[in-house]
Amino acid sequence: MEIKQLFALSVALLMAFPAFADNYPIVSPTVEYTDSTGVLIIKHTSESFTEQAPLTIRFKANPENTAGYTMNYQWTINNTKDPSFNIVNYTEEFEQTFTRAGEFSIKLLYTYTDADGKQMSEQTDSIKFTIKESKLDFPNAFSPNGDRLNDKYKAKVCQSIVEFRASIYNRWGKKLYSWTDPYDGWDGTFNGKPVKQGVYFVNVVAKGADGHEYHIRRDVNLLRGYTEVTNTTTP
């Protein structure tokens, strides 16, 4: 008799709380991005990471067991160092590009409603990441001689640069080359032909993810007869 009563009580509880009788919806949020080496990185809740700007991230809720339920999502992204920064998104999956330095926290609140209109909400653990502050510096010489070592004049330090323009001039002030990709550079040519060895001038205007503005102007020594030497032996 006692067993029958316990069974009846269990059935009654399951009928009163159908979410526990079936597999109710769950989410497994992830963030995906490609790092500076071209590798796809996937992070989950309670994980953290550090990257540089600009950084484009795809946010995915990855819901399961949603049959028979209506799903609603609310992503919240905050910059803990900048209270004015706040992003809210209501889609299951979306992309966002980050161009500011700071420490960011991502949370997902999801709500599921069954056919009878009963609704439940749950919030996931946060995913945290840091966008590095900016750095930018250029060398004063390069040697475009085909040895694949220092063949292109480009930044020797580059981190979290979100706006960039550089131009090369000869000693008479003629512009020879310009580029807008902070990881690109000048190969020592003008109109497809190598320029002479000598001193040139670079002008760089850039802005970092931390708001820092760069104005770099300096001489550039182009050394055609110079060969880079690398030490391949262990001292």
Locate each region found by the language model.
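Short loop/turn motifs at secondary-structure boundaries
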Residues: 44-49, 53-63, 128-235
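Surface-exposed, flexible coil segments in extracellular/virion-facing regions
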Residues: 67-96
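Proline-enriched interdomain boundary motifs that mark the N-terminal boundary
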Residues: 23-45, 134-139
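Short, aromatic- and glycine-rich surface loops/edge beta-strands on solvent-exposed regions
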Residues: 103-114, 198-204
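Bacterial N-terminal signal peptides that target proteins for export
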Residues: 1-7
